[in-house]
Amino acid sequence: MMSRESQPGLHRQLSRRNMLAAMGLAGAAAVSLPVLSACGVGGRTNAPNGASEVTGGFDWRKASGSTINILQTPHPYQQSYQPLLKEFTELTGINVNVDLVPEADYFTKLNTELAGGTGKHDAFMLGAYFIWQYGPPGWIEDLNPWLQNSSATNAEYDFEDIFEGLRTSTRWDFELGNPLGTGGQWAIPWGFENNVVAYNKAYFDQRGITKLPDNFDDFIQLAIDLTDRSENRYGIATRGSKSWATIHPGFMTQYVREGAVDYTFDGTDLVAEMDSDKAVEFTRKWIEMQHKAGPTSWTTYDYPNATGDLGDGTAMMVYDADSATYPKNKPGASAQAGNLGWYPGPAGPDGNYKTNLWTWTWAMNANSRNKLPAWLFIQWATGKESMNKAVEGGIYADPVRQSVFDTTFKRIAADQHGYLETFETVIGSSKIQFTPQKKFFDTTKDWAVALQDIYGGDDAASRLRSLAKTNTSKVNL
């Protein structure tokens, strides 16, 4: 690795930066995620942003001869890009060392490393919700100065080609009550998931079901009608385990479509709204749906269980990440491969298709000693050319760029019934629907626990009042 002083284009510093199986790690780097407080290990770091050190004209080979270390978890995105890494090295002269960590251990390792301030890994895969945890203590670099520096960023990069909801979902100023889209650009979206409904189209056709329900009550009734316990067939699979990840896919998507919100801001404090009339009514219906049409072991379900049941032909519908179900329809991937379809799920009472998303992103370590080569890597990995090539492999869904979706992905996914139409229906209102706040993982896990308690017999209104009171207290500490 070249010394910082000897690398061209820098004055002195060059620093920066669940589907557990190959076929579909959905948003879920989330499955059994140990959450460490952002400030609980290690202190705040104040590493200077490295973008201003890069001068002169843009040149992909400006950091040639350097080496970067990146941290990833096995995932279809990672697998789609792995064969392309040699092209990055040929383009830039930068060598890339990849460390792969199993999803179950990934965020624990990353959290510990960032808190220690070692700068060992220059760039890493990051779920957008983790920005709210890793950003406030200064562990990740603001990438906006890099985007704005024409010496560091190719004029053809076209950041605005990335869907607006994704760009918004990776910005925040860390101020209580302020929405996403404010503050720094803490990561660059790389691949993402809309939480919508996948269904067994072959079985629907067999039953003569041609009209898919466009309101939640009809959706619940369809799920019940599809359920026959004697034939080991049930209507709807969703996550139900005692994890924050139970809330963010189908539950949160339909929750906001029905007009409920998680928090409001009164000018001073966030106020939890899980006990509002709309929230209570929706939650009662959601839990009733699990009892009458969900898996009998719903309280243990994470996304691999839900999508696995769809692929096996046990679940007739799944309300979860589209890119988690997409691979199940590929030849040989599941018993129901070729039989699946997608639709947005029921609209809200006012016809809205608000959708909660998960995005895998690339972020840079604020303590990296190799910031220019790390930025060149992030720029390449999220750029048009490499993303088009990655999508060609057939397991990369969904691309974050409009241009890649409109060309390569539309061609690759053309035979996936309803997938493209569903994507285009929801993309205009797909974003992180949660209110950003630094206690997200703790309070959202508490929400999942409350759902389990209601499933077990607790009164919904009183249990949600208790949850709201506790969460209001936690988020304002």
Curated annotation (Swiss-Prot):
Lineage top rank: taxon: Bacteria
Keywords: Signal, Sugar transport, Transport
Disruption phenotype: Cells lacking this gene are defective for growth on erythritol or on L-threitol.
Record bears the keyword Signal: yes
UniProt-listed GO biological process terms: carbohydrate transport; carbohydrate utilization; cellular response to carbohydrate stimulus
Role: Part of an ABC transporter complex involved in erythritol/L-threitol import. Binds erythritol and L-threitol. Functions in the transport for the degradation pathways of erythritol and L-threitol, that allow M.smegmatis to grow on these compounds as the sole carbon source.
Signal peptide range: 1-38
Family designation: Belongs to the bacterial solute-binding protein 1 family.
Modification after translation, per record: Predicted to be exported by the Tat system. The position of the signal peptide cleavage has not been experimentally proven.
Coiled coil: none
Gene Ontology molecular-function annotations: carbohydrate binding
Name assigned to this protein: Erythritol/L-threitol-binding protein
Induction / repression: Up-regulated during growth on erythritol, D-threitol or L-threitol relative to growth on glycerol.
Organism per entry: Mycolicibacterium smegmatis (strain ATCC 700084 / mc(2)155)
PANTHER family: ABC TRANSPORTER PERIPLASMIC-BINDING PROTEIN YCJN-RELATED (PTHR43649:SF34), ARABINOSE-BINDING PROTEIN-RELATED (PTHR43649)
